[in-house]
C-alpha cells in the first residue's frame, strides 16, 4: 500500500513537471530588475546605437515561448556602456552620430535559446543570449565585430511557473552580458590597438 502511494505521488509530480514545461510562456523582462552599474569609465568617447529592432526585440526560441527583452537589454547594456566610456551618446541610427574620434558601437542579438526541465531532465531553466557588437570608428571604418555570449539559469525551478522561471533565467543572462561587457571590452586586441593609435594622434596634435 505504501509503495502504491509513493508511486502515485511520483507520477503526479512527473505529470506536473511535464505539464509545466510543455505549456506556453510569454515572458516580459522588466528594466527595474537591474542595478545601476558602478564602474570608473575610461577617457574614451562612444556613440552607442540601439536601433528599433534592438530596443523592441522579442525572442522566440521556440513556437511556445516568447521573451520580450528589448527594453531590458537596452537599459542593462546602456548602463554597462556608461561604465566603460566617460563621454557617451545613446542614439538610434548612424545618422545621429555627433562625436569625432569616437567608437561607434551597434549591438545586435544573433540568437536566443531556452532549455527547460523536459529538455535536460534537470530541475532548472536556462537561457542563452548571443550578442554581436559591430564596432567602428567615427569615420565608418570597422574596428571589430565582437561575439558576446551570455548565460543564465534558475537555481531551482520547483514552485516556479514556466513564465517566471524563464524570466528569472533571462534576467541572470542579461546581468551576465553586462558583466562580460564591463570586464572584457578593453581586453579586445583591436580596441586596445585603436586606443593606442588615438592616443598617439592626440600627442602629435
Q: Where do the protein language model's features map onto the residues?
A:
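Bacterial N-terminal signal peptides that target proteins for export
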Residues: 1-10
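A structural "domain/chain start" motif
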Residues: 21-80, 187-205
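Surface-exposed short loop/turn segments
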Residues: 23-30, 93-145, 154-158
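Short secondary-structure boundary motifs at beta->alpha junctions and helix caps
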Residues: 62-69, 139-186
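Mid-chain, structured segments of secreted extracytoplasmic proteins
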Residues: 72-97, 107
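Sec-exported extracytoplasmic/periplasmic mature domains
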Residues: 81-86, 90, 178-190
Amino acid at each position: 500500500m505504501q509503495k502504491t502511494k509513493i508511486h502515485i505521488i511520483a507520477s503526479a509530480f512527473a505529470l506536473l513537471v511535464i505539464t509545466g514545461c510543455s505549456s506556453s510562456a510569454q515572458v516580459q523582462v522588466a528594466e527595474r530588475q537591474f542595478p545601476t552599474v558602478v564602474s570608473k569609465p575610461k577617457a574614451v568617447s562612444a556613440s552607442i546605437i540601439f536601433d528599433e529592432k534592438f530596443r523592441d526585440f522579442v525572442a522566440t526560441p521556440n513556437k511556445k515561448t516568447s521573451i520580450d527583452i528589448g527594453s531590458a537589454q537596452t537599459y542593462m547594456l546602456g548602463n554597462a556602456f556608461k561604465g566603460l566610456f566617460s563621454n557617451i551618446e545613446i542614439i538610434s541610427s548612424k545618422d545621429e552620430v555627433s562625436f569625432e574620434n569616437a567608437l561607434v558601437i551597434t549591438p545586435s542579438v544573433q540568437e536566443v535559446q531556452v532549455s527547460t526541465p523536459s529538455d535536460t531532465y534537470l530541475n532548472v531553466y536556462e537561457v542563452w543570449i548571443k550578442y554581436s557588437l559591430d564596432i567602428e570608428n567615427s569615420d565608418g571604418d570597422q574596428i571589430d565585430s565582437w561575439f558576446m555570449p551570455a548565460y543564465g539559469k534558475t537555481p531551482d525551478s520547483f514552485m516556479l511557473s514556466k513564465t517566471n522561471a524563464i524570466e528569472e533565467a533571462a534576467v541572470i543572462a542579461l546581468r551576465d552580458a553586462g558583466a562580460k561587457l564591463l570586464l572584457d571590452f578593453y581586453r579586445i586586441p583591436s580596441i586596445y590597438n585603436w586606443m593606442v593609435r588615438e592616443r598617439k594622434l592626440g600627442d602629435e596634435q
